[in-house]
C-alpha cells in the first residue's frame, strides 16, 4: 500500500499532465478505511472483498463479509439476508484466485514493446512493476516483484469515458488504471 500511496499525485504537482489519487474504501467487516485496489473503480480492497462483492452484486449470493442483498431501489422482492456461502468455501476460492499465475512474456517483440511503451509515457500510470507486501496472508505471495502494469490509482478520464456512476470514493469519470499483464495471452 505504501508504494501505491507514494505514486499519488492528485493535483499533478509534478506537472507531467497526469493526476491520480488512491481510492479509499471501507472494509465492510471492520469498518476501517483501506486502499481500494480491485474493480474498475478500485471499489474493493482485497481479493476476498472483490470476490464477496461479485457474489453479492452479480449473482445474489450472501457471505459473512456482505450478508445483505444488494437490491437497489427498483427491486420490490429482494432476497433474504442469510449467509449462503460459508467462510471456509469463500476462503478456498480466494486462495485459488490469489494463486493464479500470469503467463510469462513470450517473445522479443513483446519485450521491445515495453521500451516503446515506456518511451511513449504509458508507464507513468501503467507502472511496470511493484512489490507485494511482506505481510500478505499467503507466504507464497510475500515480497514478490510483480509486473501488473498499473499504479492502482484513480484517474479522471473525462466526460467522454464517464459512466455517471460513482463507486466508493470514485466519481463517474474516474477509473482505476487497468492492469495490462497477461493481455497478450487472450
Give the ranges of each region predicted by the language model:
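Periplasmic c-type cytochrome electron-transfer domains
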Residues: 1-186
Amino acid at each position: 500500500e505504501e508504494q501505491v500511496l507514494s505514486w499519488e499525485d492528485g493535483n499533478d504537482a509534478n506537472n507531467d499532465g497526469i493526476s491520480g489519487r488512491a481510492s479509499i474504501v471501507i472494509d465492510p467487516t471492520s469498518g476501517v478505511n483501506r486502499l481500494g485496489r480491485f474493480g474498475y473503480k478500485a471499489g474493493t480492497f482485497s481479493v476476498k472483498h472483490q470476490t464477496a462483492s461479485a457474489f453479492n452484486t452479480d449473482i445474489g449470493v450472501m457471505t459473512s463479509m456482505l450478508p445483505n442483498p444488494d437490491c437497489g431501489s427498483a427491486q420490490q422482492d429482494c432476497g433474504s439476508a442469510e449467509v449462503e456461502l460459508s467462510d471456509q468455501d469463500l476462503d478456498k476460492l480466494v486462495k485459488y484466485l490469489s494463486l493464479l499465475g500470469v503467463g510469462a512474456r513470450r517473445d522479443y517483440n513483446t519485450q521491445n514493446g515495453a521500451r516503446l511503451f515506456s518511451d511513449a509515457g504509458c508507464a507513468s500510470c501503467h507502472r511496470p512493476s511493484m512489490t507485494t507486501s511482506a505481510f500478505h496472508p499467503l507466504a507464497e505471495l510475500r515480497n514478490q516483484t510483480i509486473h501488473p502494469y498499473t499504479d492502482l490509482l484513480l484517474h479522471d478520464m473525462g466526460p467522454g469515458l464517464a459512466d455517471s456512476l460513482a463507486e466508493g470514493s470514485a466519481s463517474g469519470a474516474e477509473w482505476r488504471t487497468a492492469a495490462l499483464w497477461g493481455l497478450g495471452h487472450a
